[in-house]
């Protein structure tokens, strides 16, 4: 563990969706987001992680479409399902036409009332559900290494 920093922010996407205006929720409910592994914000760190894992596909771009709002299969609650690291545009819209609404949604998702900050310590263990929570590791421990082990479970396709 680094002597300082390295916390992770978690954001509740149920609340992010539920606090949008009724008109905004109606607009978003039918939209599909296009997500890319090659988005400039994440491409470099992704390539480094895959290269470090000795995978030959580090530079391969993965593109997938998901609903902007998904329904959690177990709770039935609706959650905002766009991500500043991967969502590049809305289906049938250009990146330029999508940009303003996406930037609004990305900022909305990060509102303090939706987030908590997890301070890692030796032996810490965290569980979260990517279907309704987003996480953001804070890279503020320059010159130090943070080693963690992650397990990702297979899940359902967003609906």
Spans of model-derived segments:
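Non-heme Fe(II) oxygenase catalytic core, chiefly the N-lobe of the double-stranded beta-helix
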Residues: 1-125, 130-159
């Amino acid at each position: 563990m680094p002597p300082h920093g390295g916390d992770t922010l978690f954001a509740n996407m149920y609340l992010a969706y539920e606090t949008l205006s009724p008109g905004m929720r109606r607009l978003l409910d039918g939209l599909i987001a296009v997500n890319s592994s090659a988005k400039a914000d994440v491409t470099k760190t992704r390539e480094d992680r895959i290269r470090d894992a000795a995978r030959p596909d580090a530079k391969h771009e993965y593109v997938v479409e998901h609903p902007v709002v998904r329904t959690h299969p177990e709770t039935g609650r609706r959650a905002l399902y766009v991500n500043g690291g991967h969502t590049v545009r809305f289906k049938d819209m250009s990146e330029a036409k999508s940009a303003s609404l996406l930037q609004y949604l990305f900022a909305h998702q990060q509102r303090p009332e939706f987030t908590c900050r997890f301070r890692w310590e030796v032996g810490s263990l965290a569980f979260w559900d990517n279907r309704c929570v987003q996480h953001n590791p804070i890279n503020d421990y320059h010159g130090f290494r943070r080693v963690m082990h992650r397990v990702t479970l297979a899940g359902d396709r967003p609906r």
